[in-house]
Amino acid sequence: MRITAVDDKKNLFEVRDLIPMDILEAVNKIDLDQVPYDKMGWLEFSSRKALQPLDGSAMAELQNYIKTLHNVLSDSLGFKVHTIESTFWLDSHNFIFPAHIDNPGIESAMQIYLNDCPNTGTIFYQVEPEEIEDKDDSQKWHYTGTIPPRSIRHEFAFEKNNGYIMINNRTQLHGMNGKLNASQRRFSLYCWIN
């Protein structure tokens, strides 16, 4: 397992080999089309399903394992991790993920990719504070610069057992280029870290 800061800001980390191979292999044997799910409520995420793992399944085992990583994450991130909650996302045909900044309600987040889906990983951009507008809405932070942003801070490859941890702030602009085609599916574990 490796958790490495992508630069000297130490608020964005690459995560590699976090999940034990036996759990990862068991998760990838599951027929994802048979797993219960909730559709995401936002229009831009209409091609995203939040999978609901069955009790006792390999997916539930993975969620339980992730909850045991408080000390590992605390040591790597430099702050005390109290809770790790997670959900499984399955993105399919026509999924888009435009550049955005998470709202301040998300303190820190981790996304671990569970399959390979080339050229669809999350891209974090280098933006200046003056390109961010604060609004009195649920999103709060809004990027006002050029689309797509000119400067890439780091691009994470959508590869099995790879991903990132983001400590949220008003300049953590991120998204995915393009749109998934009919043969592409992104399967990941998304975690809220507090």
What would you call each of these model-derived segments?
Residues 1-77:
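Non-heme Fe(II)/2-oxoglutarate
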Residues 79-194:
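Catalytic core of non-heme Fe(II) oxygenases with the double-stranded beta-helix
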